Amino acid sequence: MSETIVNCPTCNQDVIWKPESKYRPFCSERCQLIDLGEWANEEKRIAAVENDVMTSDLEGHY
């Protein structure tokens, strides 16, 4: 069975995908924290879908 190798989302270094890889998909704690900081600073976000069906259900129901 061959090893699965992924790229670190922060620095693109190869990371072996296995339970022992403590920071997977990141190569290190440093890269993991950089990514977390980008989310916290709202530099990254999940794109919203315009005219989402659920959005109209939530409007005016606070």
Curated annotation (Swiss-Prot):
Quaternary structure (record): Interacts with GyrB.
The UniProt family comment states:
Belongs to the DNA gyrase inhibitor YacG family.
Identify the taxonomic lineage of the organism of origin: Bacteria, Pseudomonadati, Pseudomonadota, Gammaproteobacteria, Pasteurellales
Q: Which organism is it from?
A: Actinobacillus pleuropneumoniae serotype 5b (strain L20)
Name of the protein in question: DNA gyrase inhibitor YacG
Q: Quote the record's cofactor note.
A: Binds 1 zinc ion.
A molecular-function term among this protein's GO annotations:
DNA topoisomerase type II (double strand cut, ATP-hydrolyzing) inhibitor activity
Q: Which UniProt keywords apply?
A: Metal-binding, Zinc
Xref: Pfam families: YacG
Query: What cofactors does the UniProt entry give for this protein?
Result: Zn(2+)
Q: Where is Zn(2+) annotated to bind?
A: 8, 11, 27, 31
List, in alphabetical order, the GO biological process terms annotated in this UniProt record: regulation of DNA-templated transcription
Question: Which superkingdom does the taxonomy of this entry point to?
Answer: Bacteria
Reported function: Inhibits all the catalytic activities of DNA gyrase by preventing its interaction with DNA. Acts by binding directly to the C-terminal domain of GyrB, which probably disrupts DNA binding by the gyrase.
The UniProt entry, under InterPro entries, shows: DNA_gyrase_inhibitor_YacG, Znf_NHR/GATA
